[in-house]
């Protein structure tokens, strides 16, 4: 019954904001048409708004869970029109705070201690309130030196899980209906979108997980002059309550306050871009909700000329697979070099597109997207926009993207927006390019490769004895399969030639991999004999030969 009442309320809001056109051609539209005479007409003010603005206002009226839904949907620029996505980015996750005494009770249940014991002081008036949780100022009891540390306590809203479960169940029902009836359901993929929203909200409901995210990010940026991450107070953290050290700063979009504090905005903007690319390509752990409200600037007067960002809210973090990291970095470098052929090849090699796509068509599509950008001044070029438009054009060729890549697009867009607010003349390409080049050099340097091999040495030692038998078995199967091939036409001869080349490449690659394994084993065993630096000479020889074999295999593609 509650679900029916909730659905009817959603229907009324859809009609009042004139959003029924979004459901055109579905059974829902027919039901809404029947209900239309009983719903008050939209005001002239609402009717004059764009469709994106009307959707934003409707989501705000439906409540905090739908606000969160809209914020997540705004990241799916591969699914929704640009004008709607832009409006949804304006959604503000600010709601009326819940009672401070209720927050106190939640903290006590979470920590298993009275608040008066856990904290020397706890302010029941929240500092900030959002749809999932709200934040309270507090002070820890004195430590061994008698110091009382200022902290903030993030507390989940009461019964928020039940409310989210009910709304998500309704969204699943609506998604199933849309998938069965909407003419563009294969492009919209409604159930996939709802599943992504459900996963994001579930992650945000576990504050202990958010604390772990903050702890990992802090470890990566310990002692940095570019980014500060508050310390997690684990003794006062649980699933429904997260305690962090209290930090003071200026929101990164408050230009007037930054100028009044004498902050070097130009240096700060460049740092923001460098921090983002370092998080993505060095650490593979990036803050995926990096809007101005979650990114502050350290207000310490001593940091005016060497400013530092402060990260807040670690509920949504992003990671890419190693393959996506590599292909994305290579894609950016191909954009820098205007190498459209390579961009097209990378989209296929990464598995984002089917292997039977015509590379020349994809190359032409990439050229049509990128060339107009290169006529602009460098300060007006947005890498995020280029990437989003490339992926949107590639959808015509059955592009498949992982949610983490879509999350990265949105984060890159946010970071560029913050950077351009701080420094309107920021040349994002000039800042990003050397960072990417350095990271790619370091990522594939011999030292790093040997380090990775040494880290995997136990696994390699376990499987190494089986390698000769497996290689022999595989080669035997290939030879037998080749002898059974009956050459009947020029096409089959070409196929036979391709297979032989492939076999040669595979054998070369296996040989190279085996030599690298030998190099890693020698490096890990520390044998007697000659050394070059800290690495045995035979390890250098084996590693060099293995690398050469892999390079030959790669060049024979």
UniProtKB/Swiss-Prot annotation:
According to the record, the segments passing through the membrane are: 506-526, 535-555
Main location (coarse class) = membrane
Q: What does the UniProt entry say about where the protein is found? A: Cell inner membrane
Q: Could you tell me the keywords of this UniProt record?
A: ATP-binding, Cell inner membrane, Cell membrane, Kinase, Membrane, Nucleotide-binding, Transferase, Transmembrane, Transmembrane helix, Ubiquinone biosynthesis
Q: How does it sit in the membrane?
A: Multi-pass membrane protein
* Active-site residue list: 289
Classification via CDD domains:
UbiB
Which InterPro entries does the UniProt entry name for this protein?
ABC1_dom (IPR004147), Kinase-like_dom_sf (IPR011009), UbiB (IPR010232), UbiB_bact (IPR045308), UbiB_kinase (IPR050154)
Class of the enzyme per the UniProt entry, highest EC level: transferase
| Its EC number(s) | 2.7.-.-
The pathway entry for this protein reads as: Cofactor biosynthesis; ubiquinone biosynthesis [regulation]
Residues holding ATP: 127-135, 154
Q: Which BP terms in the Gene Ontology apply to this protein?
A: regulation of ubiquinone biosynthetic process; ubiquinone biosynthetic process
The organism's place on the tree of life at top rank? Bacteria
User: Keyword Cell membrane, does the record have it?
Assistant: yes
Sequence ranges assigned to domain Protein kinase in this UniProt record: 121-509
GO CC: one term? plasma membrane
Q: Which GO terms describe its molecular function?
A: ATP binding; protein kinase activity
Q: Which NCBIfam families match?
A: PRK04750.1, UbiB
According to its UniProt entry, the function of this protein is described as: Is probably a protein kinase regulator of UbiI activity which is involved in aerobic coenzyme Q (ubiquinone) biosynthesis.
Q: Which family does it belong to?
A: Belongs to the ABC1 family. UbiB subfamily.
Q: Which HAMAP family match?
A: UbiB
What protein is this chain from?
A: Probable protein kinase UbiB
Report which gene this protein is encoded by: ubiB
